[in-house]
Curated annotation (Swiss-Prot):
Source species: Xenopus tropicalis
Name of protein: UAP56-interacting factor
Locations listed in the record: Nucleus, Nucleoplasm; Nucleus speckle
Gene that encodes it: fyttd1
GO biological processes: mRNA export from nucleus
Membership in a protein family: Belongs to the UIF family.
Length: 289
């Protein structure tokens, strides 16, 4: 497309021209400059797929970085410490993790045992129990088994609530674990005796105290109450302090007990008391009859 030629010669002085002609001439010069920029190839106007217009830089004097093989940094790129922090976020999203009901299913338990067998040492059957405990404390699978135990315990809270309910009412609660279920999982078999069973096949035994039965010394020792806490014990030397204040001039009990006297009777008694006091002190006025 050839540039438009002006109807007015360029050599004509703009002072002698009319205002409308000057405006037309300026517009034509502006259009001519835009066409020159297009032919140079510095900018190219395009329309993208979502219907917006934009300017695309194709070639020209301004693209020195691209000609030298350098890449311009895009806006919003994470670098340095922020990039390291973003890399630590990689992993399984909480939205993609299976729920506890699926996680504790038999299929998940089998995969967990396979993972345990892969992480065992080669001479696993020769070691003693103490060395096995030290091995599992040092191994990285110890944290995984702890998380598995916590999830497994959350699924078995009904027996725990029932045992707590009965123990608060003075009933002794004892849980029996099926130890044959956890022979290949030493972490699950190392549950302390004071905790409730986390196995699905646990038996709950409740024993009620019988006063007619013969009590032994061992059972009496287990039923003894705990010593009181030091912050709950009352000190012997502490005495009740008398509160500081203004002492009352009257007995409030005597005022409160005068409920059988009416107001007229009370005023009559007070009037008689005033008259009696006036006669004892003597009258200032003399009545002449």
């Amino acid at each position: 497309m050839a540039p438009l030629k002006t109807s007015v010669p360029d050599t004509m002085d703009k002072i002698d021209m009319l205002l409308d002609d000057i405006i037309k001439l300026n517009k034509q010069e502006q259009n001519r400059n835009q066409l020159k920029g297009r032919y140079n190839g510095s900018f190219r106007q395009f329309r993208n797929s979502w219907g917006r217009w934009g300017a695309q830089r194709t070639s020209g004097a301004g693209n020195t970085l691209r000609s030298q093989g350098l890449k311009k940094r895009t806006y919003g790129v994470k670098t340095g410490l922020a990039m390291r922090k973003m890399a630590s976020w990689k992993g399984t999203s909480p939205l993609n993790r299976p729920p506890l009901s699926v996680r504790n299913s038999p299929g998940q338990l089998v995969s967990f045992r396979k993972r345990m067998n892969l992480q065992r040492s080669p001479d696993f059957g020769v070691k003693t129990s103490s060395s096995l405990q030290r091995y599992y404390l040092r191994s990285s699978s110890y944290a995984q088994t702890n998380t598995f135990r916590s999830g497994f315990r959350m699924d078995q809270q009904r027996e725990t609530r029932q045992a707590t309910f009965l123990s608060r009412r003075g009933l002794k609660v004892q849980t029996l674990m099926d130890m044959d279920q956890h022979l290949d999982l030493p972490e699950l078999s190392r549950t302390p005796p004071w905790r409730t069973s986390v196995s699905s096949g646990g038996t709950l035994t409740v024993s009620i105290d019988n006063p007619s039965a013969v009590t032994s010394s061992s059972s009496l020792g287990s039923r003894l109450p705990r010593p009181p806490f030091p912050f709950l014990t009352k000190k012997e030397g502490s005495e009740t302090k008398v509160p500081k204040g203004v002492p009352l001039e009257f007995d409030i009990n005597s005022v409160a007990k005068q409920t059988g006297i009416t107001l007229n009777e009370r005023f009559k008694i007070l009037k008689e008391q005033r008259l009696a006091q006036a006669f004892t002190k003597g009258n200032r006025f003399v009545t002449v009859g």
